[in-house]
């Protein structure tokens, strides 16, 4: 049985008019009768395309400032009518079958994103007739084609040309899925927006913004790839991306070469890229198991890479490397000759670097583009039976935010190193301790249940690589609950400590720093990372 359905009549009503004139003309050229509404009908008529206004077809005018246009039995009967089953009813009531619906919805998200948007503005951009037509057509995909995305116009015309002006059930079903995804996302945005509002009628108010967190959490993601497995080989996995991902992210990066990214590759690349974004100077971040194992600045990225690698060459093996400048030939050569690496990501990659990396065919090379804004949005963590949702940790301090609490003031060089390793500590799993000197990590202690043991591990790692801890700055992602961490740091040769402060025993910790002649800086900001 042939499941193709010819397209003889289409209803077109779009807010986003990208490509709609060309698409409507293509349909008209193939003998399709076009129904349309409002601004879409006027645009098509101005372009010389024959159009029947929906109000002329239904005999019922658009009304209430356009709020009621398509909500009529002659429209929805034409869309929902089952061919071969409802034909007699449709004929009795003068309902013509509508074979294709081309609709996208009022720009609700764009409206509420505008500065100064009021609740009244938002309400007027809630589409009613559009979603109803979309859902009707998608429900009746056995007989009707629904098109909600401009990027599908060319595909539809091509299939009509290849299939005697008809579309297959397979295509109609695929387009119906896209339609339901479209309306689900749209309703989710509206629910999220209204979920942050608490009605406060009176005093000319219709709502007050109460919370950035809605009563229900709706967010839609599109599957970008299926994976061989997840974090472990017995776990199935896929990678989903937001509808409009942030610029310069692992989600939007272009893969130039290499094997498909794994679950762990993506997680680690994200950690490396977000860390390297913190620095204005040429920087390199090497990540292993979601923790920076080497971070450094340099005159150029080759120097930055060389210094970052020296922090912990053992852990750097099989790691992820991120840069905040273009990957050049010299740096690509140094990496490929020195170590095995899973992923390299940079804002751009020179043609010479691409050619050099090509010799390592499995190495994943990503180009993410430049970044001009900070990553925004929410962090979401799954727990059994629920989600933890919070702002992303964008907190960072400048020199003006720092408070020196010790008797000894930090030197200019110590202050510079303190700010450097404070940025690194933000991306190390708690409990996090970072030793640094001269814009280079000297030792990283990550993920220990005891802060003093993280400090000991940072020292051990530095010693293993022959790096001098004497004179280093130490950053701690959270306060020291006891003086033992300071005593251990002093024994290792640390001369300056940067930490949030806020412990009940701050006085004891500061006294320990003074006893050891150390400078101590409070940031007033914690950076737990779990």
From Swiss-Prot:
Protein name in UniProt: Bifunctional purine biosynthesis protein PurH
**Organism per entry:** Vibrio atlanticus (strain LGP32)
The record's listing under Gene3D superfamilies reads: 3.40.140.20, Methylglyoxal synthase-like domain (3.40.50.1380)
Q: Which reaction does it catalyse?
A: (6R)-10-formyltetrahydrofolate + 5-amino-1-(5-phospho-beta-D-ribosyl)imidazole-4-carboxamide = 5-formamido-1-(5-phospho-D-ribosyl)imidazole-4-carboxamide + (6S)-5,6,7,8-tetrahydrofolate; IMP + H2O = 5-formamido-1-(5-phospho-D-ribosyl)imidazole-4-carboxamide
Q: Pathway membership of this protein? A: Purine metabolism; IMP biosynthesis via de novo pathway; 5-formamido-1-(5-phospho-D-ribosyl)imidazole-4-carboxamide from 5-amino-1-(5-phospho-D-ribosyl)imidazole-4-carboxamide (10-formyl THF route): step 1/1; Purine metabolism; IMP biosynthesis via de novo pathway; IMP from 5-formamido-1-(5-phospho-D-ribosyl)imidazole-4-carboxamide: step 1/1
Q: Does the keyword Ribonucleoprotein apply?
A: no
Instruction: Show the taxonomic lineage.
Output: Bacteria, Pseudomonadati, Pseudomonadota, Gammaproteobacteria, Vibrionales
Q: Which domain of life, per UniProt?
A: Bacteria
Q: Which InterPro entries match?
A: AICAR_Tfase_dup_dom_sf, Cytidine_deaminase-like, MGS-like_dom, MGS-like_dom_sf, PurH-like
